[in-house]
Amino acid sequence: MEHKDDDDDDVSFAKWMSSFWGHSWREEDQRGLRERHRPQATSHRKTSLPCPLPVLPRIPSSDRHPRRHSHEDQEFRCRSSDRLPRRHSHEDQKFRCRSHVRDYGEYSEDGSFKEPLESKGRSHSKIEKFSESFERQLCFRTKRSASLGPESRKERNERECLRMEIKSRKKVEEERSSRKEEHGEAHMAPLFEKGPE
C-alpha cells in the first residue's frame, strides 16, 4: 500500500516538474523520451559543443596538474577553432598538451618528468623583488617627508634602522644562496670524479 503512495508522489512530482519547465509529462511519456535519456556517447557530446575540441594525446593521471581556465582562455579557444583547421606537428601537440606544466616542470625527450631548475632560484628572485619594492617605497616616503618639512630625529632614526635591516636581510639571503650553491657544487663534484663503475 505504501509503495503505491510513493509511486503516486513520484508521478505527481514528475508532472509538476514538467509543467514547471513548460512541457507536458504525458506527451513525453507517449513519445518514449524517457527511454532515450540514457547516458550519451562521448562522440555525441563532443559534437554538441559550441566549438570543436582539439584532439590532444592523453596524459596519464599522475602527470596532470590543476590549472584554472579563465573566461578569456575559453573565448580564445573558440575563436581560434573557428579558423580553418591546420595540421599540427607532434611538437605542437606536445606544447599544447603540456604547456600547463611549465610552472611545475618539464618533460624530457624520453617522456620523463623533470623539476624545473628555475624553481630553486624563483623564491630568491621574489625576495629580491620584494626588497627592491620596499626600498622604493621607503625612498618615496623620505622624499615626500623631506618636501613636507624637516625630518625629526625620530623619523631619521627609523629610516636608518629600516635601511640597515634591509641591507642585513640582503646579506643573509646572499650568504644563504652562496652556501646553497657551494653545497650543491660540493655534492656534485664527487659524483663527477667517480665516473662509471
UniProtKB/Swiss-Prot annotation:
Comp. bias (Basic and acidic residues): 70-128, 167-186
Superkingdom of source: Eukaryota
Start and end residues of each stretch annotated as Disordered: 28-128, 167-197
Pfam families: LNP1 (PF15419)
Skewed-composition ranges (Basic residues): 34-47
Stated name of the protein: Leukemia NUP98 fusion partner 1 homolog
Organism: Macaca fascicularis
